[in-house]
Regions:
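Active-site microenvironment for binding and transforming phosphate-containing groups
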Residues: 1-214
Length: 214
């Protein structure tokens, strides 16, 4: 389990690992207890992730579980994303509003990161969680030409770099990376990896606003 605080305290982040178990299958009460203990969060909100560019507010997610791939909120509730190769991203603005984003290649191409950042205020910073990297992400699908057109620098031979694609998006929208985990989910062994055989299991990345806003 890994904790990260944004440098100015605007947001707090928690990332679970393989040793913490499958957080998708875990009972809701266990997930809630986890974020309460490690993030001092009042609740955990999640979405039914569908590889889209849909952004859902914490208030909407609290009413009922909704489909989408980015959650935006403010305050002591933890916003979460479940992944096993896609990129889990935490965005936070200078006012303490937070977004958690699920970004695989489909989401990046659809503009989920831009859509989430648009729902935040100024001076947005980012934490980038563990995901599959170019060392292991062989990609030969028919979608490749479209991805190469949008992200010309994202392919190294037959291997896809989600980092390169994400870096281009951040540069275009003016988001600064202030933290992350420089590990590949497939070859590090510390996290679940869909391509590494973890077809159903997922690890959790969760975040809430910093203490001064809670």
């Amino acid at each position: 389990m890994i904790r990260f605080s944004f440098p100015d305290g605007r947001a707090e982040v928690l990332v679970t690992g393989r040793e913490d178990g499958d957080l998708r299958a875990a009972p809701r009460a266990d997930r809630e207890s986890l974020v309460e203990r490690h993030l001092a969060a009042t609740e955990l909100l999640l979405l039914e992730q569908v590889h889209s560019s849909t952004v859902v507010s914490a208030e909407e997610a609290r009413e009922q579980r909704r489909q989408g791939d980015a959650l935006v909120g403010f305050g002591p509730a933890a916003l979460g994303v479940l992944t096993a190769d896609c990129v889990p991203i935490v965005l936070a603005d200078r006012g303490g509003a937070v977004a958690t984003v699920h970004a695989g290649w489909r989401g990046l191409a659809a503009g989920v990161v831009e859509a989430a950042a648009d729902r935040l205020g100024s001076e947005v910073e980012a934490f980038v969680g563990p995901h599959i990297r170019a060392c292991c992400y062989e990609f030969r699908g028919p979608e490749r030409p479209g991805l190469e057109q949008r992200f010309p620098e994202c392919f190294h031979g037959d291997y896809l770099s989600l980092d390169a694609a994400l870096g281009r998006v951040f540069e275009e929208i003016g988001v600064t990376i202030v933290g992350g985990l420089d590990e590949c989910t497939m070859c590090s062994g510390r996290f679940f990896s869909y391509r590494g055989g973890s077809r159903a299991e997922r690890f959790l990345t969760a975040a809430r606003s910093g203490d001064r806003w809670c």
